[in-house]
Regions:
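Active-site core segments that coordinate phosphate-bearing ligands/cofactors
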Residues: 1-118
């Protein structure tokens, strides 16, 4: 068994909802995220709020969000951060895929992932 760990998923979601004062469970944020064009916000996010685990293992890495403007919204920032998380998961997968058999199974865990409707 091979794997790669990240600390970004649920931690980024919880941090962004708290800091950006987004509602917890009304569904409006999720609807706005789903309706938004991928990368339509013009932001770039490095979601390393707790350092980086896979693939570089840089514990001192920190998050960054660039491209902010007067029209940037809280959901834009959350979307950019979550896209950064997805990019990180893709990077882990790219590293692991050559080591796996052609009929491999990807297993993802975590509270936020388990509660996600999609």
């Amino acid at each position: 068994m091979v794997g790669g760990a990240t600390s970004e998923g649920g931690n980024v979601w919880a941090w962004a909802r708290r800091v950006l004062a987004l509602p917890e469970r009304d569904g409006a944020v999720e609807e706005a995220l789903a309706a938004a064009e991928p990368d339509g916000h013009g932001l770039t996010a490095l979601p390393f709020l707790a350092g980086e685990r896979s693939t570089g293992w840089h514990e001192d890495a920190r998050a960054a969000l660039t491209g902010l403007g007067l029209a940037t919204t809280a959901p834009d920032m959350l979307r950019a951060l979550l896209e950064g998380v997805a990019f990180r998961l893709g990077a882990v997968y790219e590293r692991l895929a050559p080591l796996a058999s052609s009929d491999h199974t990807v297993v993802a865990t975590g509270g936020a992932l388990a509660r996600s409707p999609t």
